[in-house]
Regions:
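Helix-loop-helix "sensor" segment of P-loop NTPases
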Residues: 192-237
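Walker A/P-loop-proximal flanking segment of P-loop NTPase domains
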Residues: 1-37, 44-53
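P-loop NTPase nucleotide-binding core
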Residues: 30-141, 147-156, 325-334
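Sensor-1/coupling segment of RecA-like P-loop NTPase cores
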Residues: 149-196, 209
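Conserved catalytic network of the ASCE P-loop NTPase/AAA+ motor domain
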Residues: 24-26, 54-56, 132-136, 168-176, ...
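Alpha-helical DNA-recognition elements
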Residues: 52, 255, 350-353
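C-terminal leucine-rich, beta-strand-based interaction scaffolds used for sensing/assembly
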Residues: 282, 286-383
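Amphipathic alpha-helical "lid/sensor" segments that cap RecA-like P-loop NTPase cores
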Residues: 222, 226-286, 297
């Protein structure tokens, strides 16, 4: 059976080395934050490559995607992760349990049958994970995908501080280590979790997740089923134009179904594929721009300032209020809207409701999709 997943084993090994380094001053001991745009293969890599590489080295791995169920409060999702991972017979943690020859695991003085392992009432996350790590004599790696959503609720923030306490305890000389790997689809939003001393993972290591490249393009071409192979260089250029998003290439390929297995003139398939990719990009761009065009003048002004200021955006700062007025005058000089904090608050709430803006629990705002700023700039909507 042909593997439907493109694998990145070398990258997985490199990150596994960094995550599991036992050097006392290894940056990953404080946490590793990986940022990459949404739909660029990050989550697939975590599940299909990095997780197996870590398990192969003896680590117990827990994984949760905070984007998977938007209705589930992020803090509860993290707690549920620990409980469900311990309870599932096929979880990486229980595999390590059995490999260690454990039939029962004692957590905080309480015995649980392996098939029914859970967190007992009154046992802190730090105490439970420390006891488990000690019994396994192995490090625990906790992967939190789309981790920025933890910052949107008080429960999520509390869970992060609980994990910080667990990290500090397990990374002491008395235990075997806890590594937190947090990923996010927006670098500015992910940065909020480690940019301030008031945050749980202040100054944790952060890096840009390497995008898919030529090797993915060649794998894609080899698996299209087309009689005439696509030109690798042209396809690579198209892939870069998509923002390195595999689903756009797959969508475009789906529009060439009538060509699969049929002989075509040299270059004809490439031309049609390029048209299909460009069409898919235009369709996606138009959907975002349509939402922008539907905004009120003040909402549009606030969105433009947010996109322009990026990580420095402070919604109620004097410089932002002045920037709103400037943008509003450009959008609609006759709008007749006063730039006052209550009006700005209403505009921000509307942008959040339209999924154009994202709000952290402590009041920070950022674009929901970072690519929107680049699109708006390309269309002359930003200074």
């Amino acid at each position: 059976m042909i593997d439907p997943v493109f694998h990145r084993p070398q990258l997985a090994q490199q990150l596994a080395d960094r995550i599991l380094s036992d050097a006392p001053l290894a940056p990953a001991r404080s946490g590793l934050f990986l940022a990459a745009p949404r739909r660029t293969g990050k989550s697939t890599f975590l599940r299909e490559d990095l997780m197996p590489a870590l398990i192969e080295r003896g680590a117990a791995v827990l994984y949760v995607d905070l984007w998977a169920d938007k209705a589930l409060e992020p803090g509860q999702a993290i707690v549920s992760l620990v409980r469900s991972a311990l309870a599932q017979e096929d979880s990486g943690l229980l595999k390590v349990f059995r490999k260690a020859g454990l039939e029962k695991v004692a957590v905080g003085g309480l015995d649980f049958d392996v098939a029914k392992v859970g967190l007992g009432t009154g046992i802190t996350l730090a105490a439970a994970l420390a006891e488990l790590s000690d019994r396994l004599k192995a490090p625990i790696v906790l992967m939190i995908d789309e981790a920025q959503h933890a910052a949107t609720t008080d429960g999520g923030n509390n869970a992060l501080f609980a994990l910080k306490a667990a990290r500090d305890e397990l990374n002491s000389s008395a235990h075997h280590g806890l590594r937190i790997v947090a990923t996010g689809s927006s670098r500015p939003k992910l940065a909020l979790l480690r940019a301030s001393k008031d945050q749980a993972f202040f100054k944790a290591a952060m890096q840009t997740f390497p995008p898919l490249g030529r090797d993915y393009v060649e794998w894609f071409i080899a698996n299209t089923g087309l009689s005439n192979s696509l030109d690798a260089s042209r396809t690579e250029t198209l892939f870069a134009r998509t923002g390195s998003r595999p689903e756009v290439l797959v969508q475009a390929l789906g529009e060439l179904d009538d060509l699969v297995g049929s002989p075509q003139a040299k270059g004809a398939v490439d031309d049609q594929f390029e048209d299909a990719v460009n069409g898919a990009i235009a369709e996606s761009d138009e959907a975002m721009l349509k939402a922008v065009r539907a905004l009120t003048p003040l909402q549009g002004a606030v969105l433009r300032v947010m996109a322009t200021q990026g990580e420095d955006y402070a919604p109620y700062a004097q410089k932002s209020l002045e920037a709103y007025a400037k943008q509003l005058a450009k959008i609609d000089p006759e709008a007749g809207v006063r730039i006052e904090i209550p009006n700005v608050q209403s505009a921000l709430q509307a942008l959040q409701a339209k999924s154009l803006a994202w709000r952290a629990a402590h009041g920070e705002y950022a674009l929901e999709e970072q690519s929107l700023a680049e699109l708006m700039k390309s269309r002359g909507l930003l200074d």
